[in-house]
């Protein structure tokens, strides 16, 4: 067991880069305002540009609808819908890739016409973390999101969300957003205050965080382990509720105030799942049930979910999942149908990509458009390097290797009970840290009483899959996955096939 280490927070100003500031030429803005007014007038929907808000990627032109003379000689204000329908005509007149019309702008008596800038400016994480909008949030889980169209920094409190759903196509900035949120949290919390559970089926986005002391276990990349991860998180949530009841605490903040000085504080858990689509294709019913239960109940225990997907379809983001994730971020998507799946309204299909996003807050009636913060690979490397170096410096030269080994086999004392496992031939990072012996039928030595029956079953059917064992043996997902792993180790079945195809039975007696 590793000795307790007292960690120190980094100076984030030394680890992050400053953003670049690009001012839009005033003459260009005036010319675009003139074109907007002339175009509206030519379609019998006159309006006057009363406000111009240049942003890092787009500029918002605030248009106040004008009046038309009726046949009776009375003045009648132009309908907001008349302006909103002219988005394609305005884009043509302005020679813009696409424009988005917000009709009306919430809290203002004007219609917002959002036009892309000729040059794009990056929004740095450092600039948002130094802004008053970020610093005045009193929470350990405050996150920097980006700059709104009017140039206002946008930050949010993850504990208030309390979970976040992120969706967008490839190249839209979704993965950068996830990394920016993780980086922001790492810069504000020690491993005693915050721990991560990361799931990365694509094996490219989150594996770089392996080795930091904030991880409950190395990043999970084995698709067949992910349901077990969610089941473990659910058990941890229930364990925390029992601890709350024992001392009369209402939530994690109340618990940490009431415990004695010699007791370990309960850390926040943030579960990051990089691609929901892979999991929904593998075990849709179990995934939906677990995510819904965690989203409904985990907030008080300090467990928060951040889930992203590049396939925002109704079979991936189901109604039950969406109902329990009121905080959502939509990046550029392919169609208005996909936008409705995420936000319940169109608009995301008109975003520009590369960090252009719509943030739907639980408190807001309408989504807010903004340019998301950008965190480079070099900045992430400096942040993870800081924590790894501190672990080695304070824990000894072998601390990093010991941490990975202990985490992999579930033997680190993190203030929770982790089931003991036998060491198998599977990679250490994917050991069954997440499994419960009582649920899997394991006797503590790695033997399962159903193993022989499972082998006989797959040999008779000449195929093997987790869902097959679940149906035929009437067992849970985790136990079935362990039986499949055991048979693969023993050379009875082959490796996983593409998609959801069953495995091949390769050995007969």
What would you call each of these model-derived segments?
Residues 43, 240, 244-247, 390, ...:
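Solvent-exposed amphipathic alpha-helical surface segments
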Residues 16-23, 74, 217, 221, ...:
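Short coil/turn segments at secondary-structure junctions
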Residues 258-261:
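Conserved helix/coil segment N-terminal to the catalytic DExD/H
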Residues 1-10, 58-60, 82, 89-93, ...:
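P-loop NTPase catalytic phosphate-binding loop
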Residues 264, 268, 280-282, 288-293, ...:
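Conserved P-loop NTPase motor module
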Residues 251-254, 432-433:
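A detector of tandemly repeated sequence units and domain arrays
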Residues 67, 312-313, 471-476:
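Conserved short loop/turn motifs at secondary-structure junctions
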Residues 1-155, 160-163, 190, 404-442, ...:
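Low-complexity, intrinsically disordered P/S/T-rich segments
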């Amino acid at each position: 067991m590793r000795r307790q280490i007292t960690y120190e927070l980094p100076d984030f100003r030394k680890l992050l880069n400053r953003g670049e500031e690009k001012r839009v030429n005033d003459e260009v803005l005036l010319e675009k305002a003139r074109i907007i007014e002339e175009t509206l007038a030519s379609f019998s929907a006159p309006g006057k540009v009363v406000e111009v808000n240049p942003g890092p990627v787009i500029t918002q032109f605030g248009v106040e609808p004008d009046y038309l003379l009726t046949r009776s000689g009375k003045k009648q204000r132009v309908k907001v819908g008349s302006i909103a329908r002219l988005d394609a005509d305005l884009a043509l007149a302005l020679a813009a890739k696409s424009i988005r019309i917000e009709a009306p702008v919430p809290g203002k008596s004007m219609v917002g016409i959002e036009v892309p800038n000729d040059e794009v400016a990056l929004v740095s994480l450092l600039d948002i973390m130094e802004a008053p909008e970020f610093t005045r949030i009193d929470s350990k889980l405050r996150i920097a999101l980006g700059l709104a169209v009017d140039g206002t920094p946008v930050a949010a409190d993850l504990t208030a969300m309390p979970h976040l759903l992120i969706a967008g196509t490839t190249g839209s900035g979704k993965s950068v957003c996830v990394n920016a949120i993780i980086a922001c949290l790492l810069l504000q919390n020690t491993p005693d205050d915050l721990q991560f559970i990361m799931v990365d089926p694509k094996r490219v986005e989150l594996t770089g965080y392996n080795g930091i002391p904030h991880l409950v276990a190395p990043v999970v990349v084995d698709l067949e382990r992910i349901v077990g991860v969610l089941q473990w998180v659910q058990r941890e949530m229930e364990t925390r509720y029992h601890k709350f009841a024992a001392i009369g605490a209402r939530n994690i903040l109340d618990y940490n105030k009431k415990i004695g000085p010699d007791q370990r504080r309960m850390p926040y858990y943030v579960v990051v799942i990089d691609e929901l689509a892979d999991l929904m294709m593998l075990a849709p019913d179990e995934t939906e049930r677990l995510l819904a239960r965690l989203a409904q109940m985990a907030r008080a225990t300090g467990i928060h979910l951040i889930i992203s997907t590049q396939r925002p379809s109704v079979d991936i983001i189901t109604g039950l999942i969406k109902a329990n994730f009121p905080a959502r971020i939509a990046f550029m998507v392919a169609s208005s149908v996909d936008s409705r799946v995420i936000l319940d309204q169109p608009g995301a299909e008109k975003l520009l990509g590369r960090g252009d996003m719509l943030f739907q807050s639980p408190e807001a009636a309408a989504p807010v458009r903004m340019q998301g913060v950008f965190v480079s690979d070099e900045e992430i490397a400096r942040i993870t390097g800081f924590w790894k170096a501190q672990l080695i410096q304070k824990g000894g030269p072998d601390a990093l290797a010991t941490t990975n080994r202990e985490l992999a086999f579930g033997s680190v004392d993190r203030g929770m009970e982790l089931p003991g496992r036998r060491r198998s031939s599977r990679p250490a990072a994917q050991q069954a840290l997440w499994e419960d012996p009582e649920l899997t039928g394991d006797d503590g030595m790695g033997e399962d009483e159903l193993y022989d029956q499972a082998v006989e079953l797959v040999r008779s059917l000449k195929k093997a899959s987790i869902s097959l064992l679940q149906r035929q043996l009437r067992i849970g997902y985790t136990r079935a996955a362990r039986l499949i792993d055991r048979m693969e180790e023993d050379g009875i079945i082959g490796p996983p096939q593409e998609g959801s195809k069953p495995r091949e039975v390769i050995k007969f007696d």
